[in-house]
Amino acid sequence: MKKSLLALAVLTAFAGAASAQSSVTIGGKIDLAVGKLIGSADKGLFDTPGSRLNFGGREDLGGGMAAVFGIEHRFSPDTGTSTSATNFWNGYSWVGLNGGFGTVRLGRDYTSAFINVQNQVDPFGGDNAGALRAALLAGVAKVRFANGVKYFNTMGGLSMSYDISEGGVNNTGAADATVVNKPWSGSVTYAAGPVWLAFSHENPGGKNDKLTTLGARFAMGPAVLRAGMSNGTNNANAKVKSYLLGANIRMGAGDIRLGYATLKTGSVTSMKRLGVGYHYDLSKRTKVYATLGRDSATAFKAEPTGFDFGIQHNF
């Protein structure tokens, strides 16, 4: 009996050690709003933040090294369908190694320029009817890469990231004759106290397209001030230039979001957008929000206004 108890104790200890060395997490969010988008006359339910279900994992390999993975499915909660007809793991699907050297990921992921710079400057985080992030993307930048490699590392307040993927495919992984080079992007960010500064440069893979983005944030009491600019050329060899100014102001459980962005493509002002919004936290994971966006550029003359009233639950 004592031997059986001892054996059970040893097995339990080994099982506990194994589970401590490996972990899998499940997360995501569901978001739905009533409203309309700038440039569209359609009113109804929609999901601008991108409802998602994701899985992530980490296995300790010893010596300070770990195997990591991440997969994310995007879906439309109003219909229950996938947002992509071709990619089930449309958000990302990567596997990699992490250690003292940094992190290497292989597969499909966000570009360094997008996730580390362009998305960080928008006070709306690219979500809702008032989102301003599109100005910094300037019709040039890609949100994701496919069939690629990504490396990133952080040393103190300095973070660096670089990704490169196969030429001849777009950011969904499908064949695309306009992508003649190997798409790549790189970013450097620096954070010290209330100050955050960022730089990125990228070539999304076309013969002529390239884009440089600068970003800054400054925390001041309950407010975070944001600024960004992008400059480059698109694949038609037209110059693009954009500016963004924004702020988030925290008031108790509420978050006031506001900003303004412009984009000029060649000689045409293709975006002049104002966004204002209010998000209210019902709990740590659930919030309600209201957002208004208006674009005075000629391209949106017929439908210059967008708005949404929604609820978001994170899990």
Locate each region found by the language model:
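Outer-membrane beta-barrel proteins
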Residues: 1-315
